[in-house]
Amino acid sequence: AAQRELTKIRNEFGAFSDIILFFSDTKNFRKKIMPEYKGHRNRKKPCGYKRVINQLKTEYEVIIMPELEADDSMGVYATQNPGNIIVSPDKDMKQIPGELYNLNERFTITKEEGAAWHLSQCLSGDQTDGYGGVPGIGVKRAEALFNKEGYSWKTVLKAFKDKGLTEEDALVNARLARILTVDDYDFKKQEARLWSPSSSYRVNYGARSKDESTRG
């Protein structure tokens, strides 16, 4: 099954395209932020999982980074080595600037679009991964709010506080939602750098942000 999917990808990009495969480490830095993260997924890997990876290693370059999920490893690699194409159907990868192929279409994501999508996911949460965002806010409502108020950390905090939640709740959701880039990883310590926005963090994206720039 894995080889079938890889053959499809080769056919999409040409037989001479190099394919690098990314897999999640057995440890996950997000569990340090929220121990119950993906708690409902604590089932063992399928029988033969390691054997499949070991077989793929004989034919492809395989990358597994300490304490990172595959999405994070792709994000770090893609931003460290611009010009590559991320292949993933996961909506989380819309945070990473560069080219993305979601198995249906290819499109280019700007740094501003990626940063804006991260903030939207912070508000909407991801029930599959076990963090809820702001109750009652989904992706469409989050985007409508940001287009009205501006894509900023201030807007995020207000949305959380309006529902009786705290700044700490907002930060936990933002850190869980964020897919790492090369700037979010300490290669010497081999660990994630947790996202820490300034109070003035704002993204140059959306109806209220045309003349503003992305700041950390």
Features from the language model and the residues they span:
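Accessible peptide chain termini
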Residues: 1, 215-216
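Extended two-metal-dependent nuclease catalytic cores across DNA- and RNA-processing enzymes
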Residues: 16, 39-215
